[in-house]
A protein has these predicted regions:
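Short helix-capping/linker segments at secondary-structure and domain boundaries
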Residues: 187-197
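N-terminal accessory regions of nucleic-acid-interacting proteins
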Residues: 1-47, 116, 127, 180, ...
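Asp/Glu-rich intrinsically disordered low-complexity tracts
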Residues: 215, 219-221, 225-226, 231, ...
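Generic alpha-helix initiation/capping and coil-helix boundary signal
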Residues: 168, 175, 224-225, 247
């Protein structure tokens, strides 16, 4: 039986083994290549889909989607939209109503894709809309994967240049992993829901208790740190008084000087 949590501790993620897409990655940089890739995907039974956009560090400026990654269990195609735009074959893929396209936070991706061209979204399934069925409240891909599979999806490549002339191997593997992971999550969530083969652990919310002044005085003895703080405060008060006397003396001397001048 699998143990899952309603909320996964993000501090535990770094200690988990990293997962990477194990299959073949194909970069699509022409319309003819896109046509072939779309024909392949529409012959499959499921697709994992995600997008990447070049980060903008200028307020109010946002780049268009640069990459559309579409994965099966074995092969992931990376459509370089910054080179080929949105050809008819890609629109046909995104508008299809026969092969389910699994993603996460699809509303954001579709809005971004619409900035390139208008299309009618097809059979999209958002993991965020179904994960609550098994009691999980987290919505990020990294937390969901860590929770359900006990593996880490690294996000180090997320803010790299997705409009580079050539994507490096780390970028390609990262992009493929995100799309492929959506298939794994979707199928495992459905399996757990159908078989009930899991134990849900509800994590208690961390609360900060604020004690009343009297309670704090009764429950705590004065620590050396408190004593030194009080002493420091007294020293500050004495120093302030000394400064005040010095100022008064200076004013008195100034008045004497004015009187003599007259």
């Amino acid at each position: 039986m699998k143990t899952i949590y309603n909320k996964y501790d993000k501090n535990k993620i770094n200690a988990l083994p990293q997962v990477l897409f194990p299959g073949k990655i194909v970069v699509v940089q022409s319309e003819s290549e896109a046509d072939k890739a779309v024909d392949y995907h529409l012959s499959c039974d499921i697709m994992g889909v995600d997008t990447e956009t070049k980060p903008s560090f200028k307020k109010g400026h946002m780049h268009k989607v640069a990459l559309l990654q579409v994965s099966t269990r074995e092969v992931c195609f990376l459509f370089r939209l910054n080179f080929i735009g949105m050809p008819p074959s890609v629109i046909r893929l995104l508008s299809n109503t026969t092969v389910p396209m699994i993603g996460l936070s699809w509303h954001d991706d579709i809005c971004s894709l619409h900035r390139r061209t208008d299309f009618t979204p097809g059979l999209f399934i958002d993991i965020q809309n179904i994960v609550g069925r098994i009691g999980i409240e987290d919505l990020s891909l990294q937390k969901l994967y860590a929770n359900i599979f006990g593996e880490k999806i690294s996000k180090r490549q997320r803010l790299t240049n997705w409009e580079a002339d050539v994507l490096n191997e780390k970028q390609k593997r990262y992009a493929a992993t995100d799309a492929w992971a959506c298939i794994n999550l979707y199928q495992e969530i459905l399996r757990l829901e159908a078989e009930g083969d899991f134990k849900l652990v509800k994590v208690k919310e961390k609360t900060v208790e604020v004690a009343a002044p009297n309670d704090a005085a009764n429950d705590k003895e004065e620590s050396p740190k408190d004593v030194s703080s009080e002493a420091a405060l007294n020293d500050k008060e004495v120093s302030s008084k000394d400064n005040q006397l010095t100022l008064q003396e200076m004013l008195a001397k100034a008045k004497e000087s004015l009187a003599m001048a007259k």
